[in-house]
């Protein structure tokens, strides 16, 4: 696995969604299915592991089956593991085809593919009268400690990027905003690690600032979204191409 903008995005989206919905147990079956797909294709796993990490966006299906099924513990574990392995196997097969739908203008291509899988799975589960009601567990406000930790972390990330950059690379920070962001837009490869880290910090600060400005809340889901934005600030996102969407 090479260090790239896409790998940074995959790792940060894993960390961000670990704040709401993902955990080790509901991700492992999906990664196992991803490994099985690599074996099926007779390829090395590192070719598909990034897709596997993104595929864990459907990890709640694993938890849902384990919690909801009215059967023995062993059968619930087996059903949850099988559905996770199925997800991990199917999404890598589907993702290359969904990329042609949007021609690189959707940076969340694996999530797009996973959406089709989720629709199919929910249709099947509802056919068996397995459905989940809406649940809202939401913390209000901007906790001072969490806000301080986030701002301190962003300052450290920006400073780290600055230290990693020479004079030429510092000029590339402005050049990042001239990229369209259309995939594949690997800022780590095109502009260097330092400018990419600084762009990630700027995007994180802007996201938190926007949440505060509109009276939003800083909690697991919103912080997960901020971390996801930071991850994709290494792979296509920058202030110039995100501002019009936020304004809309």
Predicted regions and their residues:
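Pore-lining transmembrane helices
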Residues: 1-106, 111-248
């Amino acid at each position: 696995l090479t260090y790239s903008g896409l790998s940074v995005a995959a790792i940060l989206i894993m960390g961000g969604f670990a704040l709401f919905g993902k955990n080790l147990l509901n991700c492992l079956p999906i990664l196992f299915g991803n490994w099985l797909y690599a074996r099926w294709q007779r390829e090395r796993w590192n070719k598909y592991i990034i897709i596997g990490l993104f595929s864990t966006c459907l990890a709640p299906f694993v938890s849902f089956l384990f919690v909801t099924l009215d059967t023995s513990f062993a059968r619930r574990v087996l059903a949850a593991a099988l559905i996770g392995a199925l997800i991990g196997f199917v999404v890598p097969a589907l993702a290359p085809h969904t990329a042609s739908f949007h021609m690189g203008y959707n940076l969340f291509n694996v999530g797009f593919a996973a959406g089709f899988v989720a629709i199919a799975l929910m249709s099947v589960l509802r056919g068996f009268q397995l459905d989940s009601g809406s649940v809202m567990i939401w913390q209000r406000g901007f906790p001072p400690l969490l806000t301080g930790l986030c701002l301190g972390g962003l300052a450290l990330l920006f400073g780290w990027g600055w230290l990693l950059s020479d004079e030429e690379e510092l000029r590339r920070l402005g050049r990042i905003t001239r990229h369209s962001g259309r995939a594949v837009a690997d800022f780590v490869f095109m502009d260097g690690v330092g400018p990419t880290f600084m762009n990630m910090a700027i995007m994180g600060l802007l996201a938190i600032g926007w949440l505060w400005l509109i009276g939003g809340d800083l909690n697991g889901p919103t912080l997960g979204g901020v971390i996801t934005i930071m991850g994709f600030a290494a792979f296509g996102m920058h202030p110039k191409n995100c501002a019009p969407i936020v304004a809309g």
